[in-house]
Amino acid sequence: MALTVASCGNASDPKLNQTGATPDLPKVNETLVPPMKISPPAGWNGETPTVPQGFTISAFATDLKIPRQMLVLPNGDVLIAEGRGGHAPAMRPKDVIAGVIKKQGNTKIKGGNRITLVRDANNDGTPELRTVLVDNLDAPYGLAYVDGYLYVAEQGALVRFAFQPGQTGIATPAERVTELPSRINHHWTKSLTASADGSKLYVGTGSNSNIGERGMAVEEERATVWEIDRATGARRTIATGIRNPTALAIEPTTNLLWSVVNERDELGPQLVPDYLTQVRDGAFYGWPYSYWGQNRDPRVMPQNPEMVAKAIRPDYALGSHVAALGLDFARNGGFGGSFANGAFIGMHGSWNRQDPSGYKVVWVPFNAGRPAGQPVDFATGFLKDGKARGRPVGVAFDGNKRVLFVADDLSNTVWRIAPAR
């Protein structure tokens, strides 16, 4: 049975459109204690997620230690970041309750704090090699490979290792590229990707609170995306007010940077939509003062109408509380057909609404480098009979082998999706 904390007026309206460029935004429904419901874990029992007709899905790697983000190397090896971070203390009684609720839906496995390498050289879905590439890391999350270096975004620093595809181990110590904001670490994950030409790295850092309730002093350099010059290490902030940019990726037809973002809680089951957006240089996305552009959050004190007036709207709503954690784009024609151009998005799933949202991988079609249509369920079945069998995190597309990998940090599995042969 799901562990639940109910509150008045917590039902969702199925008639509201929660996705796309123009989502319906209902009235604010603030309650003393927000509705909370987590689906308890259950095993797969030999079953797998459900994928569209014409595709197959299989377990590529099992018994991992909290797989998060992944990286497909030029030679096809798959790197898997494993770990758990964060150490923010609870401030309010409802924070304690929320922490208890969330734990019911998480794995009890201790995070590996490592990167695992898996090799399937002949692309038959059965790896020939699995090994720990490097361990003793500090909650690794984002990964990037550029010009002989593997970059790892830990919860407190961006580090790099001298590395060439084909290696199966790293013995040299990490070189620190730059410190990353790590005070409190309410949102500890640090997303990472490289620019198309490899000259720049991008790091996303989440906020230290829901809506600034810890004070704005601890939000310095939080809720941001940084651009880091790979040659000099110099960094600059390119986006602010972007509450929790959990995954970054380059759209391949335009070479522009995109992110999935987790929005704020406790305004009701259908506020605020998590979103997919192009990360625009100099943009302010509203947090904490407003949401979805210039919709003012009445809870934030003091109010800041000047900042609200600067806020821009994101590009594409994904639904409220879906907890989008994974993002990658199809390349080299993707899977072809309906899945040739667009974004794969891993949705970890909700904890603060009575009817669950997320718990799946969706496909957002693109045309001319922009979202072009409603999201399509691509991998489902992570919820069954009110229980969670898995929770998607990172997604990684191999454009050469036409394979999509999905990290599942509840069953500690990486799933492999490919066209049926």
Can you say where each PLM-predicted feature lies in the sequence?
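C-terminal motif of bacterial Sec signal peptides marking the signal peptidase cleavage site
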Residues: 4-7
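Beta-propeller domain segments
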Residues: 9-51, 89-91, 97-106, 110, ...
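Surface loop/turn motifs at the tips and blade-to-blade linkers of beta-strand repeat domains
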Residues: 59-64, 131-138, 177-184, 237-241, ...
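Short loop/turn segments immediately following the C-termini of beta-strands
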Residues: 75, 83-85, 155-157, 163, ...
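Short coil/turn segments that connect the beta-strands within blades of beta-propeller domains
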Residues: 75-76, 147-148, 197-199, 254-255, ...
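Residue position within the beta-strands of beta-propeller blades
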Residues: 79-81, 152-153, 202-204, 258-261, ...
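Asp-box/WD-like beta-propeller blade repeats and closely related beta-sheet repeat scaffolds
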Residues: 126-149, 154-196, 207-210
